[in-house]
Curated annotation (Swiss-Prot):
Cofactor: pyridoxal 5'-phosphate
The organism of origin for this protein: Methylorubrum extorquens (strain ATCC 14718 / DSM 1338 / JCM 2805 / NCIMB 9133 / AM1)
Effect of disrupting the coding gene: Mutants cannot grow on Cl compounds (methanol, methylamine, and formate) but grow normally on C2 compounds (ethanol and ethylamine).
Pathway this chain belongs to: One-carbon metabolism; formaldehyde assimilation via serine pathway
Domain of life according to the entry: Bacteria
Protein name per Swiss-Prot or TrEMBL: Serine--glyoxylate aminotransferase
Length: 402
């Protein structure tokens, strides 16, 4: 008789959704309540302020939407821009591609800088394009901070310097869905006008809560759209409705109550660990994963170390090996969920997510499972080599700075 239950637990190592801490799951086990009660602001008002901290902001305004990160992409574009407005965007992976596609479908004129997959946004090219835009027709620059399809992180600080060097007034929009809460993010210092996050990655929650940190400059741009016949349509994602309700602790429509309680607990987890320790932990886990990849004799999709992501590693399968089979075998045989290759890299890479609530032994389990699946699929890997390399690195590099 075939087994109908798999013992143990599924090992989730995709780059999102991520593992949810037990205490966060417990925090979300709440009874329904009146979201217009006099008590409700005691939950929400501190949330608006505390959420700013993971964005590296004291000056921004936080809006929380029942949505995914994709919805917040639309919120940023539709509130600040008008049909036909020109925006500059680099395309170097599936998610930068999808954001560009959304902008085009909304009626924006997107100037696309095509970059090789495995690299990221090039600040020098952005500066060049902005310098050439003498009439300041480009209204915004769109950049994906951490491209999970290829395991690449772009340098947003350098992008800001490029915009400033060009003397250009364009808004800066940054997709931080797979970086915020895991990698250093400095919305105020980098003068990010719309910083976008989702609940299901570094914030360690289920999907369903979209977060945006909006600068004063972006708020003014949104106000400037009022009354324009060519303004982009928006209703559900309209900031004005949020601005009227949020200061009193309420929302213009029913919020996802369990996710708000979960967000409060997830932020407490991050703050108790210390954000600098969170970032350091992700850096150590990312490098340990890359040590394992090198020991296997394989390469990452990231073309050079400067592009390495510390939340996900995309690993190139050897020539002639279908990465999809490695992923399927890992799931069926070892109950390990690895990330699939997307679009241009479909069947060419498998991805190990190392984002969220993880420690050394969590990661080593994923590396062991990936290693066994590689060997089972005929890849010539020395058994134990990746685990040994990663564990050696982890022993020498504690996850906490102090």
């Amino acid at each position: 008789m075939a087994a109908t239950r798999r013992p143990g637990r599924n090992h989730l190592f995709v780059p999102g959704p991520t593992n949810i801490p037990d205490r966060v799951m417990r925090a979300m086990m709440v009874q329904s309540e009146d979201h217009r009660s006099v008590d409700f602001p005691s939950l929400t008002k501190p949330l608006f302020e505390d959420t700013k901290k993971v964005f590296g902001s004291t000056e921004g305004t936080i809006f929380l939407f029942p949505a995914s990160g994709t919805g917040i992409w639309e919120s940023a574009l539709s509130n600040t821009l008008a049909r036909g407005d020109k925006v500059l965007a680099a395309r170097f992976g599936q998610f930068s591609h999808l954001w560009i596609d959304m902008a085009q479908r909304l009626g924006l004129d997107v100037v696309v800088q095509e970059e090789e997959w495995g690299t990221g946004a090039k600040p020098e090219k952005i500066e060049e394009a902005l310098r050439a835009d003498k009439n300041h027709e480009i209204k915004a620059v769109m950049v994906v901070h951490n491209e999970t399809a290829t395991g690449v992180t772009s340098n947003i600080g350098a992008v800001r310097k490029a915009i400033d060097a060009a003397g250009h007034p364009a808004l800066l929009f940054v997709d931080g869905v797979s970086s915020i809460g895991s990698l250093p993010f400095k919305a105020d210092e980098w003068k990010v006008d719309c910083a976008i996050a989702g609940s299901q990655k570094g914030l360690m929650l289920p999907a369903g809560l979209g977060v945006i940190c909006v600068s004063q400059k972006a708020l003014k741009a949104a106000e400037g759209q009022s009354g324009r016949n060519d303004r982009l349509a928006r209703v559900y994602f309209d900031w004005e409705d949020q601005k009227k309700q949020n200061p009193t602790g309420y929302f213009p429509y029913t919020p996802p109550l369990p996710l708000l309680y979960g967000l409060r607990e997830a932020l407490a987890c991050l703050f108790e660990e210390g954000l600098e320790n969170v970032y350091h932990r992700h850096a150590v886990l990312g490098e340990a994963t890359r040590q394992a990849v090198a020991a296997w004799g394989l390469k990452t999709c990231a073309k050079s170390p400067e592009w390495n992501s510390d939340t996900v590693t995309a690993i190139l399968a050897p020539e002639g090996v279908d990465a999809a089979k490695i992923i399927k075998h890992a799931y069926v045989r070892y109950n390990l969920a690895l990330g699939a290759g997307l679009s241009q890299v479909a069947g060419k890479v498998f991805r190990i997510g190392h984002v969220g609530d993880l420690n050394e032994l969590s990661l080593l389990g994923a590396i062991a499972g990936a290693e066994m699946s590689l060997i089972d699929n005929g890849v010539k890997v020395t058994p134990g080599s990746g685990v040994a390399a990663a564990s050696s690195y982890l022993r020498e590099n504690p996850l906490a700075k102090a």
